[in-house]
Amino acid sequence: MDYMRIFSVFVVTLWIIRVDARVFGGRGIEKFVTFGQNYIVTWGQSHVSTLHSGEEVDLYMDQSSGGGFESKDAYGSGLFEMRIKVPSGNTGGIVTAFYLTSKGGGHDEIDFEFLGNNNGKPVTLQTNLFLNGEGNREERFLLWFNPTKHYHTYGLLWNPYQIVFYVDNIPIRVYKNENGVSYPSKPMQVEASLWNGDDWATDGGRTKVNWSYSPFIAHFRDFALSGCNIDGRSNNVGACESSNYWWNAGNYQRLSGNEQKLYEHVRSKYMNYDYCTDRSKYQTPPRECY
């Protein structure tokens, strides 16, 4: 059976369904903003370059520093997307991250992390969640494309019902808000960064950054979001749970049938680590794994 052909058909079908639903079905369309409209540089000022009137941002990593930026506003729900091209070449130990995170103790966080590699080995995409300061919910994927070659769209849907990690509009991970399961409860900002993670990121920390290949450059553009801005209100994200927000409405409370097929295919073919099945970490899997 030609799985890639089937996969391609699913991709096209899902893309058509998502466009049709958002434009003609009233589900809403993400708002595109320039970098300066919605983001500020948070660290590594000299290692951040804004291009094309704020439509693209490059982060640079060398031995002196990496760089990062965050949204000016915090949100209590929404759909957040960026198109990203991660550093190429011998990037072992280098981490490119796009994530939502709260501030202060016991933080919540929803992560995309690209783990660099050397000698032509593929970059790993790691997803993770921190809930009230507790992480260790990693799932890792070797993608069906090379994320260093072209821009691809990475999206995070967060609403009162589920968190969905999207790659090019394909759901690769779903975390459901079910009874007894920890779930984000704090306002979160959108962040991106490029940093040295060579104590863990590649080969369990055995591969260190080879600085002779620096600078490493991560590219970001098409800053799309539709979110419930919680700034100026209570820190209670309950204010952002209304179904009047299109990303909280019925069509976003669960995967569609086509999304479910894509989700199952990606996980069976491209996921190479799941914390739920790691008995060295959890003798009894966490509640959300059932």
From Swiss-Prot:
This is Xyloglucan endotransglucosylase/hydrolase protein 3. CDD domains: GH16_XET (cd02176). Keywords: Apoplast, Cell wall, Cell wall biogenesis/degradation, Disulfide bond, Glycoprotein, Glycosidase, Hydrolase, Secreted, Signal, Transferase. GO terms for molecular function: hydrolase activity, hydrolyzing O-glycosyl compounds; polysaccharide binding; xyloglucan:xyloglucosyl transferase activity. Residues 1-21 form the signal peptide. GO terms for biological process: cell wall organization; cellulose metabolic process; photoperiodism, flowering; plant-type cell wall biogenesis; xyloglucan metabolic process. Residues 22-220 form the GH16 domain. Glycans are attached at residue 210. The gene is XTH3. The active site is at 109 (nucleophile), 113 (proton donor). It comes from the Eukaryota. Disulfide bonds join 228-240, 276-289. One of its GO terms (cellular component) is apoplast. The keyword Glycoprotein applies. Belongs to the glycosyl hydrolase 16 family. XTH group 1 subfamily. Its EC number is 2.4.1.207. Predominantly expressed in flower buds. Xyloglucan binds at residues 113, 126-128, 136-138, 199-200, 204. Its main location: secreted. The keyword Cell wall biogenesis/degradation applies. It is found in: Secreted, Cell wall; Secreted, Extracellular space, Apoplast. It catalyses: breaks a beta-(1->4) bond in the backbone of a xyloglucan and transfers the xyloglucanyl segment on to O-4 of the non-reducing terminal glucose residue of an acceptor, which can be a xyloglucan or an oligosaccharide of xyloglucan. Contains at least one intrachain disulfide bond essential for its enzymatic activity. It holds the Pfam family Glyco_hydro_16. PROSITE patterns: GH16_2 (PS51762).
